[in-house]
Regions:
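Glycine-rich phosphate- or other oxyanion-binding loops that anchor nucleotides, phosphorylated ligands
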Residues: 55-90, 94-98, 143, 150
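A short glycine/small-residue-enriched secondary-structure motif
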Residues: 43-48, 78, 100-105
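A short, ordered amphipathic alpha-helix with a cationic face
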Residues: 37, 115-118
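Mixed-charge interfacial surface used for oligomerization/domain docking
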Residues: 4, 10-24, 29, 82, ...
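N-terminal glycine-rich anion-binding loop in soluble enzyme alpha/beta folds
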Residues: 4-62, 67
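Short, flexible active-site-adjacent loop segments at beta-strand->alpha-helix junctions, enriched
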Residues: 89, 116, 286
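A short, hydrophobic C-terminal helix/tail in secreted or cell-surface proteins
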Residues: 282-288
Length: 288
């Protein structure tokens, strides 16, 4: 059976890299001042982050059912017998549930994975799916293997301002104003299905240090069950030197890991704003 691996651009994988990896990518749309743009197609990350800094009206969206079905049908009518679709977490978007409903008409030829991943952790799921495909696993077997490790991943997110969380309804206007006055930086966490508040610290440097300390604690826990784990860093920094500095901080904390950096995807950046910084770690059970 020839299995196609499909994901969306929330994984940080875009069309050009997808061709190299052998992955088919559905670009995620974003609504900018009433007009639809597609991540990695007609709107760059630099342009998008600039729009956020200018506080232009931006909303995250999801691919239309027609766009998803068009991709699936083209693959299944060509060289592939079945496919695995790895969208962003169902807890962060309705795109996963939509895909699950659409897949019901394909008699198990389409397997939709819901393992609660986004950004660097979602990328790792795609790479794991490719590895399992090479081992000869079916689409259903790949889906089951990925979902078994759904909760062996965690993401911490630090943000520079509460303004974007206020616009998304995740913090009250009064809370955002007080937080700005006191230079409070929220530390958020994605563990499983939802983006939730974790703690608050004063100042950017303190937030970054606390974030890395929390990740070090998680890393030590993961090491008890696995010798091989994965470190990835993402951010919505507008300047290259800013994301380079953040990656170097993470590399210093985890000198035994080859830390990789990806731009933070549009779907998360819409809610946390520019100059946010994340540290992500996925437990690599599938590597064994």
């Amino acid at each position: 059976m020839n299995v196609a691996i499909v994901t969306d651009s929330n994984s940080g994988i875009f069309e050009e890299e997808g061709k190299i990896l052998g992955v088919h990518v559905i670009p995620m749309p974003v609504i900018l001042e009433g007009k639809t743009y597609y991540e990695g197609i007609d709107l760059t990350h630099e342009e998008f982050y600039q729009c956020l800094e200018e506080k232009r009206e931006v909303f995250s969206s999801q691919p239309s059912p027609a766009e998803v079905l068009d991709m699936w049908d083209k693959l299944l009518l060509s060289e592939y017998d079945e496919l695995v679709y790895i969208p962003m977490s169902s807890g962060l978007s309705g795109s996963c549930q939509t895909a699950q409903v659409l897949a019901q008409d394909y008699e198990e030829k389409v397997q939709v994975v819901d393992n609660h991943r986004i950004s660097v952790t979602q990328r790792q799921s795609v790479l794991d799916a490719l590895m399992l495909k090479e081992k000869g696993c079916s689409a259903k077997e790949i889906k089951e293997a990925l979902e078994q490790t759904a909760y062996e991943s965690i993401i911490y997110v630090g943000v520079e301002t509460l303004e974007y969380l206020k616009m998304g309804g995740r913090v009250t206007p009064a809370g955002a104003a007080m937080g700005t006055l006191l230079s409070i930086k929220p530390l958020l966490v994605i563990a499983g299905e939802r983006l939730d508040a974790y703690t608050k610290v004063r100042g950017t440097k303190s937030c970054k240090k606390r974030l890395l300390m929390e990740m070090k604690t998680i890393a030590d826990e993961f090491h008890k069950n696995s010798d091989e784990i994965y470190v990835g860093v993402a951010g919505s920094f507008g300047k290259k030197e800013e994301h380079q500095e953040w990656m170097e901080m993470a590399q210093e904390m985890f000198p035994w890991e080859d830390v990789k950096y990806d731009p933070l995807t549009f779907s998360i950046s819409c809610h946390v704003g520019p100059v946010s910084y994340t540290h992500l770690r996925a437990h690599e059970t599938l590597r064994h």
